[in-house]
């Protein structure tokens, strides 16, 4: 006969949650940012809006994005003219695409992560699936379970419509699951496809145009678990997490699922709101570790846009190289919502190993991962790198 206390103790892992593998995937269709404005205005039958086109060109030039990947290619858009309009009922057409494509792209990223992890997929105990693209029942988590051939008893968590902070949310949840369920191995998948947000231009709603200049498609997957076996190779420890709603930020970023798809609204002062509150989040996270020099840690910040990164850098006096991995992902992929920070995590460990920097975190021990999104919500994750 065992006591409840003994049962509870046996359920808990001994060590911290670790990221054991990372995989990423994008659709094959790649768009060049320099030629995108001409293509976008042509495909949406908006070539007559010359002034707006010039404005959009300036947005794309300032975006610091070189290229993006998109499931929506010219052929698909020509078959779905309602998706190209600014505000035409088109949710059915959009849903038909994402319900299939979101799990499919997620599978590609997950397969790569599982391969790197090197363990049989039957050892996956939990699945967290996150997407801002579309909603369905049973969800993308169920579809992915079937596509990958995971055990039917895998414990699934489906997160829909969280937005750009959710790359932090999934790591926070995965940490709690791994540390409170001994032997747990959590597959985390973020898969984002812009088919729900793509629409033609409007000169009365410029914030919608900002999204058209920034958003791209991508999926990322990680395996999270505590107490790694000798065959498992941890990449980062997940040490501490937090989520907070910024003061006076209501309505700064919001999205609404309508007949016309997912509409986005952004206020101009989003970079200001984030940079004004970033120090407080860092103090809360790093004071217990005795760290107050934020150039001494490695950085993974959701690249909502270049202005956010610029203002955070300026506010904290960060050296330009601190945001190198973050800016690289923005430049090569655009803003992929929840998947972005996991792409940056992947880029950071790869470059750190390539450059022989001694740890997975650019040679440094401690690091921070930030998610920023609707609310305005900020997710903070304290990371500890691994010696390589």
Curated annotation (Swiss-Prot):
Metabolic or biological pathway: Secondary metabolite biosynthesis; flavonoid biosynthesis
Annotated keywords: Acyltransferase, Flavonoid biosynthesis, Transferase
Keyword Isomerase: no
Keyword Chaperone on entry: no
InterPro entries: Chalcone/stilbene_synt_C (IPR012328), Chalcone/stilbene_synt_N (IPR001099), Chalcone/stilbene_synthase_AS (IPR018088), Polyketide_synthase_type-III (IPR011141), Thiolase-like (IPR016039)
Top EC class, one word: transferase
Origin: domain of life: Eukaryota
Molecular-function annotations in GO: acyltransferase activity, transferring groups other than amino-acyl groups; naringenin-chalcone synthase activity
Matches recorded under Gene3D superfamilies: 3.40.47.10
Pfam families cross-referenced by the UniProt entry: Chal_sti_synt_C, Chal_sti_synt_N
Family assignment from sequence similarity: Belongs to the thiolase-like superfamily. Chalcone/stilbene synthases family.
Record-given protein name: Chalcone synthase 6
Native source organism of the sequence: Glycine max (Soybean)
């Amino acid at each position: 006969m065992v006591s409840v206390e003994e049962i509870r103790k046996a359920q808990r892992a001994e060590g911290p949650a670790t990221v054991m593998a990372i995989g990423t995937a994008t659709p094959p269709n790649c768009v060049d940012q320099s030629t995108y404005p001409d293509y976008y205005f042509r495909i949406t039958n908006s070539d007559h809006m010359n002034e707006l086109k010039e404005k959009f060109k300036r947005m794309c030039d300032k975006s610091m994005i070189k290229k993006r990947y998109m499931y929506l290619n010219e052929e698909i858009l020509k078959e779905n003219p309602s998706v190209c309009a600014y505000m035409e009922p088109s949710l059915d057409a959009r849903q038909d695409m994402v319900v299939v494509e979101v799990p499919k792209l997620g599978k590609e990223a997950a397969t790569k992560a599982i391969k790197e992890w090197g363990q049989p997929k039957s050892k996956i105990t939990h699945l967290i699936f996150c997407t801002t693209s579309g909603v369905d029942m049973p969800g993308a988590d169920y579809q992915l379970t079937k596509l990958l051939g995971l055990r039917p008893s895998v414990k699934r968590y489906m997160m829909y419509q969280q937005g750009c902070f959710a790359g932090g949310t999934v790591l926070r949840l995965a940490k709690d699951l791994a540390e409170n369920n001994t032997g747990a191995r959590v597959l985390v998948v973020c898969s984002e496809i812009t088919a729900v947000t793509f629409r033609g231009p409007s000169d009365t709603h410029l914030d919608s145009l900002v999204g058209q200049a920034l958003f791209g498609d991508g999926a990322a997957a990680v395996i999270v678990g505590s107490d790694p076996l000798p065959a498992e190779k941890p990449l980062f420890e997940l040490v501490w997490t937090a989520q907070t709603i910024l003061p006076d930020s209501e309505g700064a970023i919001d999205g609404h699922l309508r007949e016309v798809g997912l509409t986005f609204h952004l206020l101009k002062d989003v970079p200001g709101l984030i940079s004004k509150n970033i120090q407080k989040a860092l103090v809360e996270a790093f004071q217990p570790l005795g760290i107050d020099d934020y150039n001494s840690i490695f950085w993974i910040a959701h690249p909502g846009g270049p202005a956010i990164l610029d203002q955070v850098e300026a506010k904290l006096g960060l050296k330009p190289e601190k945001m190198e991995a973050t800016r690289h992902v923005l430049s090569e992929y655009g803003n992929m919502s929840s998947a972005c920070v996991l792409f940056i995590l992947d880029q950071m460990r790869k470059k750190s190993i390539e450059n022989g920097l001694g740890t997975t975190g650019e040679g440094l021990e401690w690091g921070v991962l930030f998610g920023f999104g609707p609310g305005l919500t900020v997710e903070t994750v304290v990371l500890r790198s691994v010696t390589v």
